[in-house]
């Protein structure tokens, strides 16, 4: 369970089943615990079918829990319908009324609640200014680009300042450049509003860029909750290590521990070295090494570094960096990202060349589990 100060949302032991067309029960949420702080940007991340959208829909009220508790601002919400929850949702499809002006789209909820005309005009204008759409109240949705329509959908969702904003893959239909711009705008908007955002995405870059905390789900279970850097650098298990970012996940077993350094032998054919804190001789592990943590030359004291040997299979230019695929003597594949390589260094990256890759001992992250 994650613990947030001053939680706006608390989910306790949430369970949700679905029935397949064949009549089989599928557990979409399996005992999920989560809390979201009042000013947090929390992202639900995981593969298709992991439960992230189901979890979002239970918070919004579009799905009900089979068991467990849901509290928003300390009030039990299990029996409260969606329209009575202090929550708004922004979807991938903008769901704007095409026959209404932008101002009327944004102010629709205020009209339903009977807000006075002068106050409505002020709040609609303020919401549109916040999303960079001020002065466009009289336009119709069909006159706007996709990015502008997304901003209008956001303005509509925040016009009455909900306690919580839910975002269900709202940027996935935008092109890459616009999506990156909207990521920055969303994060700035969340800070300015001072309300909690719960964001669903399948895009890891979005999650790592925007979130205060990330919730990684798989098979209806929470695998890990943490800050983006913790999730990336210190994954809790092999699933998170393999799912988040590019990774080399090497199976190994601790052979010896001496002078604060553990030596492991694994399927990659070379001895692996890493700090021995918390490790025991004979212990099976997965060792995580990110591709960008390798160096062509030892950058410091060799005693503080480990090395992997292999033969270059492929080198691919990816902008200013080179992605190198290495195969060890035992057949294991290692992926490395080489940065700022000199012309002389590039000669060592030709396919068929023998290559030694260096890494700092503390860059290797051990993960408990059968090797």
Annotated model-derived regions:
Residues 247, 257-371:
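Non-catalytic connector elements of ABC transporters
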Residues 60:
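Helix-to-loop junction immediately C-terminal to a conserved catalytic motif
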Residues 68-76:
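Conserved ABC transporter NBD signature motif
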Residues 32-43, 97:
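Pre-Walker A (P-loop) beta-loop-beta motif of ABC nucleotide-binding domains
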Residues 82-242:
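ABC ATPase nucleotide-binding domains
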Residues 45-47:
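The feature captures the beta-strand-to-loop junction immediately N-terminal to the Walker
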């Amino acid at each position: 369970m994650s613990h947030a100060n001053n939680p706006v949302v608390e989910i306790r032991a949430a369970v949700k089943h679905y029935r397949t067309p064949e009549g089989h029960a599928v557990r979409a949420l399996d005992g999920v615990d989560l809390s979201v702080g009042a000013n947090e940007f929390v992202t639900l991340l995981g593969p298709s079918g992991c439960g992230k959208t189901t979890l979002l829909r239970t918070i919004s009220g579009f799905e009900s829990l089979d068991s467990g508790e849901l509290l928003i601002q300390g009030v039990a919400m299990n029996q409260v319908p969606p329209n009575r929850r202090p929550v708004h949702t922004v979807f991938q499809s903008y769901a704007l009324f095409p026959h209404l002006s932008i101002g009327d789209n944004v102010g629709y909820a205020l009209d339903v609640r009977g807000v006075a005309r002068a106050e409505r005009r002020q709040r609609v204008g303020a919401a549109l200014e916040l999303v960079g759409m001020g002065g466009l109240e009289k336009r119709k949705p069909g006159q706007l680009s996709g990015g502008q329509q997304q901003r209008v959908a956001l303005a509509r969702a925040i016009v009455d300042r909900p306690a919580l904003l839910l975002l269900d893959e709202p940027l996935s239909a935008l092109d890459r450049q616009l999506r990156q711009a909207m990521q920055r705008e969303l994060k700035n908007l969340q800070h300015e509003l001072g309300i909690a955002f719960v964001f669903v995405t399948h895009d890891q870059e979005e999650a790592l860029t925007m979130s205060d905390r990330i919730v990684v789900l798989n098979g209806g279970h929470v695998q890990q909750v943490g800050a983006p850097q913790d999730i990336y650098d210190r994954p809790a298990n092999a699933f998170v290590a393999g799912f988040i970012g590019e990774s080399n996940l090497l199976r190994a077993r601790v052979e010896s521990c001496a002078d604060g350094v553990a030596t492991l032998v694994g399927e990659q054919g070379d001895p692996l070295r890493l700090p021995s804190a918390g490790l025991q001789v004979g212990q099976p592990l997965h060792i995580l090494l990110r591709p960008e943590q390798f160096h062509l030359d030892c950058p410091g004291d060799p005693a503080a570094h480990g090395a992997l040997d292999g033969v270059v299979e492929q080198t691919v230019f990816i902008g200013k960096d080179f992605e190198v695929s290495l195969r060890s003597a035992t057949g294991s594949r290692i992926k490395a990202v080489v940065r700022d390589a000199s012309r002389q260094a590039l000669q060592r990256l030709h396919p068929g060349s023998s290559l030694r890759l260096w890494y700092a001992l503390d860059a290797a992250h051990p993960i408990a589990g059968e090797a």
